[in-house]
Amino acid sequence: FWILDPSVSPMAAFNNPDNRRVTPKMYLTAMSQQTNDILPEPMVLMPYLAGRERSVDMVVENGEVIAAVCRRKEGALQSIEQSGVAFELAKTCAQIMQADGLVNVQTRDDANGKPYLLEINMRPSGGVCYSRSCGINLSGIFALRKLGLIDKETAIKMGTDGFKPAVVRSVSSVIALTEQQSAE
């Protein structure tokens, strides 16, 4: 995404294109030079949300949230929680959408800390596995429910009992082990 920032130099997009900041005037100038025959591709414009991003993973059955865990993203770290305005917003979204399955809702706070809905994914997120680090195994709860091995009340209890706040760091590199290390 690009940030329309009136405080950056008109050359910002050229001097540091990876920063993805451009003046609104520069953007409007480029748009005005488009001919009627060649319209720009459709775009989504939204306010810049400077606050924290949250990812809420949930086990949902026909809009009823059975279990949920929220990951608050802070750089390379993610703090896992089970409360807050963004957490409640995500649960309400799943209910309104009548979500069903292992789903994910993304929010981001504005500069004042108010969360805004970014998207709801009717599928598991890539980070759903991190829920285990806080004592709640969302994938396990989902599987047990789908297999009919636990009732809804047990699943709800599994989604809250044993919760402990945790902080995780995503590691995406491969660490090669020696034969001796892998045998241990």
Please describe what each predicted stretch is.
Residues 2-4, 43-47, 53-71, 89, ...:
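Beta-strand scaffold of nucleotide-dependent catalytic cores
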Residues 34-42, 72-112, 117, 121-123:
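A long amphipathic alpha-helix within ATP-dependent nucleotide-binding catalytic cores
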Residues 79-81, 125-141:
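ATP-dependent carboxylate-activation loops
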Residues 88-92, 136, 140-147:
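Amphipathic alpha-helical segments that line or abut small-molecule/effector binding pockets
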Residues 49-52, 100-102:
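Short solvent-exposed loop/turn micro-motifs enriched in small/polar/acidic residues
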